[in-house]
């Protein structure tokens, strides 16, 4: 490893001797470093060499040869069939999405070649502090539910991602675990709250509404993402007055012993973040939902690491039908993907080697009776199974949390076998929820369904013009349905051609990709009325999707899930205009 004047380090990941370089064939060659176990891809075009890690940027899958590629330039990910053109380092399926991080090719005097990765300085290494031995009870971590942890750090309390009541993603996700009955008091006494990103299983407006009624000035910290985490706050009706947006990679000092640093995700930097909390030099790493937290560069040997583990946080493939999407195919895909994720998380923990690891942020359930199919199909990883896998291959101490359980960091760092290092809730404590108050939250969607704007079919043009997505060759059919995805007899059923943002009555004659989305009418109308992101539809299992060809349209979904305008459509102006137009037409007919 070499270090430059600017602090950047160069890591040699693989070296090829002269004979190995000469044996490289034109096009793609797959290589493996037997010592590290890491895989790489080299592309040769005459004298030119390009190289990258064999790691899909989407969700960390492995590339294999693309049998459909006759030019020997493209590889296919075994996870979601994403395709990478290694000659350009651009992903071609989906088109116009990511570029692959390229490795540096270095030639030596003996005609050998090294694959080198350049890395900037680790931000957490700035102003380093030696870890001080912690007393028992000095640092305690209490699991509340899902991704919500209550951290006692000396005389300070910090809370992560409070989702304690209500659903997430419209009505698709419900809490699996029953939070401790004093959860609101815990939130109110916190000195600070960290919210990792805008998804509603982390930023829960129903939860924050309860908190704001008692303590609106509580300090909340979020990362400076492209789309603000609290973009919807003004429209939510929740009054919070102390939201702090902080830059990435810079220590935020709380007191002389406590500081934290927020880092961005490498795959979704526009919205996802993770955090390092440091108390007296002891680091707690919480990667939350990040696919490649900090681009895959993370601190090793931390005191405590937390991460997601479960899978199933997407409508794919459960909500898809047609073509290959048979029940057998979906079942096998889900089983395979969960196993891959389990192994990936186990390997990540092994590589980072924390003293203690806790899987969390995956304790949700599709509990509403109308989502019985999703609940039965969308099987998730078991935290205890992951922890067993980790213990079998490392010395890492693992924790499978229960609501109200307390991990005493000081005790476990001193003695991993200390029986008082983890205190489970008392016998008889309710662990799993058995009621969810559906009506309170679903009635909100019903109000939107009956809104006056939907009396005018021109709302369709108004909405998609507001959304601002066009110039893309995709034709979309939207179908409003009932609870069970049966089309409503009087519901809207319409086409949108995004190439010119038109609304034809029939599909155009030109070649075009086609996607058909059936959505529960109450939910899609709620999303439309309030200008919400389509995560409520897709991640919340509120759609059923067919597509031809079977291609993921990254630009389309990325726009509607992340890049919609920050303010909703001006429906008042719309209604005034429509009423005026109708009045004019009536006057003309009378005349």
From Swiss-Prot:
Necessary cofactors: [2Fe-2S] cluster
Cellular component terms (Gene Ontology): cytoplasm
Xref: SUPFAM superfamilies: ISP domain (SSF50022), Metallo-hydrolase/oxidoreductase (SSF56281)
Entries under PROSITE patterns matching the protein: RIESKE (PS51296)
An annotated Gene Ontology molecular function: metal ion binding
Cofactor note text: Binds 1 [2Fe-2S] cluster per subunit.
EC number: 1.14.18.2
Catalytic activity: CMP-N-acetyl-beta-neuraminate + 2 Fe(II)-[cytochrome b5] + O2 + 2 H(+) = CMP-N-glycoloyl-beta-neuraminate + 2 Fe(III)-[cytochrome b5] + H2O
Annotated protein name in UniProt: Cytidine monophosphate-N-acetylneuraminic acid hydroxylase
Organism: Xenopus laevis (African clawed frog)
């Amino acid at each position: 490893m070499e270090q430059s004047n600017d602090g950047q380090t160069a890591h040699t990941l693989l070296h090829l001797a002269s004979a190995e370089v000469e044996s490289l064939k034109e096009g793609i060659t797959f290589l493996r470093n037997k010592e590290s176990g890491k895989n790489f891809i080299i592309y040769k075009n005459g004298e030119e060499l390009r190289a990258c890690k064999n790691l899909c940027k989407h969700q960390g899958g492995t590339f294999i040869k693309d049998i459909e590629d006759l030019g020997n330039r493209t590889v296919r990910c075994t996870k979601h069939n994403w395709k990478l053109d290694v000659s350009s380092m651009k992903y071609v399926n989906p088109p116009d999405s990511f570029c692959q991080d390229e490795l540096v090719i270095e030639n030596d005097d003996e005609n050998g070649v090294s694959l080198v990765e350049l890395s900037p300085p680790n931000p957490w290494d700035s102003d380093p502090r030696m870890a001080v031995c912690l007393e028992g009870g000095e640092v305690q971590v209490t699991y509340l539910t899902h991704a919500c942890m209550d951290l006692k750090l000396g005389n300070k309390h910090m809370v992560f991602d409070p989702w304690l009541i209500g659903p997430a993603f419209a009505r698709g996700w419900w809490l699996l675990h029953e939070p401790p009955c004093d959860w609101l008091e815990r939130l109110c006494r916190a000195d600070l709250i960290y919210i990792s990103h805008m998804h509603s299983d982390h930023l829960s407006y129903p939860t924050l509404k309860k908190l704001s009624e008692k303590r609106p000035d509580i300090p909340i910290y979020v990362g400076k993402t492209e789309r603000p985490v609290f973009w919807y706050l003004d429209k939510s009706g929740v009054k919070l007055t102390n939201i702090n947006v902080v830059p990435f990679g810079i220590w935020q000092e709380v007191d002389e012993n406590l500081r934290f640093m927020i880092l961005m995700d490498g795959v979704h930097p526009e919205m996802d973040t993770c955090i390092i909390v440091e108390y007296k030099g002891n680091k707690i790493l919480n990667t939350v939902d990040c696919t490649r937290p900090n681009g895959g560069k993370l601190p090793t040997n931390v005191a405590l690491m937390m991460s997601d583990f479960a899978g199933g946080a997407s409508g794919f493939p459960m909500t898809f039908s047609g073509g290959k999407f048979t029940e057998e195919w979906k079942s096998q895909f889900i089983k395979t993907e969960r196993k891959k994720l389990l192994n990936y998380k186990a390997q990540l923990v092994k590589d980072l080697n924390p003293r203690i690891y806790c899987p969390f942020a995956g304790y949700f359930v599709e509990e509403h009776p109308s989502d019985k199919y999703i609940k039965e199909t969308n099987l998730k990883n078991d935290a205890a199974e992951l922890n067993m896998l980790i213990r079998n291959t490392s010395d890492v101490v693992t924790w499978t949390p229960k609501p109200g359980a307390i991990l005493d960091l000081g005790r476990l760092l001193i003695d991993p076998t200390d029986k008082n290092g983890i205190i489970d809730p008392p016998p008889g404590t309710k662990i799993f929820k058995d009621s969810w108050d559906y009506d309170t939250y679903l009635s909100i969607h019903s109000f939107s369904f009956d809104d006056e704007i939907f009396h005018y079919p021109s709302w369709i043009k108004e909405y998609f013009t507001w959304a601002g997505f066009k110039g893309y060759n995709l034709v979309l059919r939207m179908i409003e349905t009932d609870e069970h995805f049966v089309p409503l007899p009087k519901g809207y059923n319409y086409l949108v051609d995004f190439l010119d943002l038109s609304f034809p009555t029939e599909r155009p004659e030109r070649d075009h990709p086609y996607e058909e989305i059936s959505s529960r009418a109450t939910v899609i109308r709620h999303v439309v009325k309030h200008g919400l992101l389509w995560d409520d539809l897709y991640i919340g299992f509120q759609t059923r999707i067919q597509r031809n060809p079977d291609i993921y349209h990254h630009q389309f979904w990325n726009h509607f899930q992340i890049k919609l305008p920050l303010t909703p459509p001006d429906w008042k102006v719309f209604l005034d205009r429509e009423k005026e137009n109708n009045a004019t037409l009536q006057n003309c007919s009378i005349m």
